[in-house]
């Protein structure tokens, strides 16, 4: 084993080329590796929703929830089944084992629901089974506030949607706040009777004509008949000429018995935006989703650049509000890692400058970036991504990986005095410390390796922690024993400068002081007892801190954010207009909140980050509140303050 590390020392040209190649490839992989907020973990969860109009919460649970829950609980690979029942709505959530195939699990869930249908009340709605994918959340939410008629606003949203979907890495774009184009046919009742026609004949004629645009309703005597189909006729102006065969056999054109109205569908959602405290105005809200494995920082940056370019054309005069940007959050995490890494390098250099000299401090500090570039290669090659879990692992590893480099550097520094030659000092240091360093690293590896065997969703979620740390530790050994000695030879000088002599003298004084302190500690039993008692007392005190709640225990503590969400859910069947009144009442509160910069309101949909996973319906609304950069309250405190302000004015959930 010693010969392997000494080989790197002897073959200097090879080692230099290897360091250059690893650095180049590592920097490339750092740019190329996908970046996202969290690991893409497929959690096999299905939700069964069923409605029963007019039923109370207890009746809903008894008549629907319990019967579906009993069938679902008997499925294979079920981990947990939870349910909730409220007025007219039943929700049953089935979480399968983490190892289960999600598609097969959802199919089994649908089969179980089908078996339960026969026991449900006849007036209950058909149960709806939804597959939950927590990774399928928007990476960018943008609202465009512009003063345009409803029709033009819809055309603008279609254009923006097409522009954004053309960007590499974008999987889909959902739009809120627009109204679809729709044609209504108002039938003249007298004409219908005169020609002996029925509504079904009109529908059949339209279907035969292959109309390819949405026809919302056929209205006869204030009764609406909703219809939809697709075909080859793509202009509403062609509809009046469609022929219908009357009872007498004579052809009748649609214009003779009905009026064709080319208009817009009834709105299913509203969207508004308020910027810098100004009154909210109509807007369209676009939620951008990324493809699996896409680089979230690049995708969101490309979308924002596309919108910036469009301000010169289709978005001229429009106000663009970015209410959520996951790419910016990930980029911030990367900046934090870089800052922490640089701070660690500087601290290591400072400590080593004060102890063994400035040359040695540079040598030891270089082991950090070299180990990191090797780690990036490993992450990229293994299919991992840069996310907050892998970033946490890298930050955690910084303080561990530098130890090996410090040991080798200090050993070479000490042995230069006895061996005279820096190369011989490096060889002697490798022979003496190679196995102890490898053994020490393996003990640390043994601490993290069991995390590979952690089962369930948590095990999948944190799988990159042991992989990243163990890979970095192995990289640190390669760097410390294979590269640091060669770098140390370059920086080590047999004849020291006057500054280095002063440094050496200072270092010796520190060592002498510590030896004297340690000698006094070891020579007096009373001093030892006092020291050990203080250490034991501090240990017990540290253990008591979480027990008494002085130190909180959280799996992933929440940090300060630049935005908060307000979710509104009224009773089942609440019209969109009534929910809009609740949303406007909340908006009035937001105008008065000193920490609010802007907000975006969407009525008719819940947030993509809510428990309902972006569901739609007249009873739902959500408001994304963008907080000011300079504020006295953090996001948690702002959220609590908003709850207090909103509670008196809402009877909604």
Where are these regions (language model features)?
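Juxtamembrane "pre-transmembrane" interface segments
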Residues: 174-178, 186, 256, 280-350, ...
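Transmembrane helices with small-residue packing motifs
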Residues: 13, 20-56, 114-123, 380, ...
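Hydrophobic transmembrane alpha-helices and their membrane-interface caps
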Residues: 26-32, 319, 346-414, 471
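Helix-loop junctions and hydrophobic alpha-helical segments within the transmembrane domains
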Residues: 323, 330, 334, 409, ...
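Surface-exposed amphipathic alpha-helical segments in non-transmembrane regions
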Residues: 16, 23, 28-32, 63-80, ...
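Small-residue-enriched core segments of transmembrane alpha-helices in multipass membrane transport
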Residues: 46, 109, 350, 361-383, ...
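Signature of alpha-helical transmembrane segments and their immediate interfacial
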Residues: 1-35, 433, 500-554
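Transmembrane alpha-helices and their membrane-interface boundaries in multi-pass membrane transporters
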Residues: 398-412, 433-453, 460-501, 623
